[in-house]
Every structure is written in structure tokens, then in C-alpha cells.
């Protein structure tokens, strides 16, 4: 079951990356943290330079610090409720289903959809500045990714001791495409065009996973796959 959860957590990071309220901001945001203008990106492709790559990595480092720290807290809380694993699993499953419906846009609770960001009037200087902006971006997060992140945290809470790996994979799911985008920033049209479908598919997947988790069918599926593939699930 853990292998599937790791795969899904990585996918949740990717879904957060392509959320409609974040995706359109990335070209300008990359220009901001790297100091490269959009005209430079289109004409000279300066994002291939080491300076730009280092700034992007520093941003992702700051981003990662927040979520890995959150994972440590989630792991601690989860260990306190180890004796109530089944109840936590079912409550977590219901929350994941709820977040799936929110992602689909079935309803929009105002408290969850409020946006809280830290804004910089001027970019802090140097690579440390990019780290700080990454931390601010993670701490401020945005409404459309809130339900996805909350689902990951809930899933982590049902698996004491696995919260930090979950959060690391969530960060990787966001970081890998972000790094790729820094090299292929002019190739964003396809994702923009299909972002609504991708988010809807993600919402449906969250609901399905929530149902499987609630009835503990995920474990049965893993056992079945193990029987079919000789002990290797393929995930």
C-alpha cells in the first residue's frame, strides 16, 4: 500500500504545480527569482546559464524546507494516534474524498479558498533571497492547491512514520516540473490549454483513492497485484 501512496503523493505534487492559479504565474515568477526577463528567455535562452539554474534550485530549497518541516510535525502527530489507525484511516479517507469534490469545484468552502501570501516589494538579493522567496511561496500557498496539499497531509497522518517521505515526494512532484520549466519555459501552451481537464482528473482520482482507503480496499488491491506479478506490484 505504501508504494502506491508514494506514487500518488508524487502525483499530488505535480497536480499542485499545474493548478490554474499557479501555472500562469511561473514564467514571470522564474524571471523574478532568476533576474532574467521574458524577452531574454525567448531570444537568448539565458535560463540555461548556471546562475539561473542555481537561483531556481535555491527557490526549491526554500520551498522544500517548509514542507519537510510540516512532514515532521505530521509524523509526530500521527504517532500519537497509532492505536487508532483504522479510525484515522477512515476519517482521512473522508477528508480526501471531500478535497476531491473541492478540487472538482462541486463546492468551495470560503475558509479553505482564502489566499494568504507573503509579498516582496523587492526581491531579496543573492541566492539567499531565492531561498527566502521559496519559503514564502510555500508558506503562502494558493487556494487551488490547498485541497491537494491537505489531502497529502491527511494521507500522511494515517501512516505514522511515513509523513516525511510523503512530503519529500510531494515536494519532488512540484520541483521536477519546475526545474524542467526553467529550461523549457516557452513550451507552456499545452498545459495551459488542458489544465482544467488535468485538475478535474486529479479530483476524480482523489475521490477514488478516498473510497479505496475508507474501505481498506487498497490493501486488497496490493495483495491481488502481488499475486498477479509475483510479489512485485509495479508501482
From Swiss-Prot:
Pfam families: DsbD_TM (PF02683)
Coiled-coil intervals, chain numbering: none
Membrane-related topology note: Multi-pass membrane protein
Source domain of life: Bacteria
Protein keywords: Cell membrane, Cytochrome c-type biogenesis, Membrane, Sporulation, Transmembrane, Transmembrane helix
GO cellular component: plasma membrane
Gene Ontology biological-process annotations: cytochrome complex assembly; sporulation resulting in formation of a cellular spore
Keyword Secreted (UniProt): no
Compartments reported by the entry: Cell membrane
Bilayer-crossing regions: 10-30, 57-77, 87-107, 133-153, 165-185, 204-224
PANTHER family linked: CYTOCHROME C-TYPE BIOGENESIS PROTEIN HI_1454-RELATED
Family: Belongs to the DsbD family.
Functional description taken from the UniProt entry: Required for cytochrome c synthesis and stage V of sporulation. Might transfer reducing equivalents across the cytoplasmic membrane, promoting efficient disulfide bond isomerization of proteins localized on the outer surface of the membrane or in the spore coat.
Designated name of the protein: Cytochrome c-type biogenesis protein CcdA
Organism this protein belongs to: Bacillus subtilis (strain 168)
Amino acid at each position: 500500500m505504501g508504494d502506491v501512496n508514494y506514487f500518488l503523493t508524487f502525483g499530488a505534487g505535480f497536480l499542485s504545480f499545474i493548478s490554474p492559479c499557479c501555472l500562469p504565474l511561473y514564467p514571470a515568477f522564474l524571471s523574478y527569482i532568476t533576474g532574467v526577463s521574458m524577452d531574454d528567455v525567448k531570444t537568448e535562452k539565458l535560463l540555461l546559464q548556471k546562475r539561473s539554474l542555481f537561483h531556481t534550485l535555491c527557490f526549491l530549497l526554500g520551498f522544500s524546507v517548509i514542507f519537510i518541516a510540516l512532514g515532521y510535525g505530521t509524523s509526530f502527530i500521527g504517532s500519537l494516534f497509532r492505536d487508532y489507525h483504522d479510525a484515522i484511516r477512515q476519517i482521512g479517507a473522508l477528508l480526501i474524498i471531500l478535497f476531491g469534490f473541492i478540487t472538482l469545484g462541486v463546492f468551495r468552502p470560503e475558509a479553505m479558498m482564502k489566499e494568504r501570501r507573503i509579498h516582496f516589494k523587492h526581491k531579496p538579493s543573492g541566492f539567499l533571497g531565492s531561498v527566502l522567496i521559496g519559503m514564502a511561496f510555500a508558506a503562502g500557498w494558493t487556494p487551488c492547491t490547498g485541497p491537494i496539499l491537505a489531502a497529502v497531509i491527511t494521507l500522511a497522518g494515517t501512516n505514522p512514520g511515513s509523513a516525511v517521505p510523503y512530503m519529500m515526494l510531494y515536494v519532488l512532484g512540484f520541483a521536477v516540473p519546475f526545474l524542467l520549466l526553467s529550461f523549457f519555459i516557452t513550451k507552456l501552451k499545452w498545459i495551459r490549454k488542458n489544465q482544467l481537464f488535468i485538475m478535474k482528473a486529479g479530483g476524480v482520482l482523489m475521490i477514488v483513492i478516498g473510497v479505496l482507503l475508507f474501505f481498506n480496499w487498497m490493501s486488497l488491491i496490493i495483495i491481488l497485484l502481488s499475486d498477479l506479478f509475483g510479489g512485485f506490484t509495479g508501482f
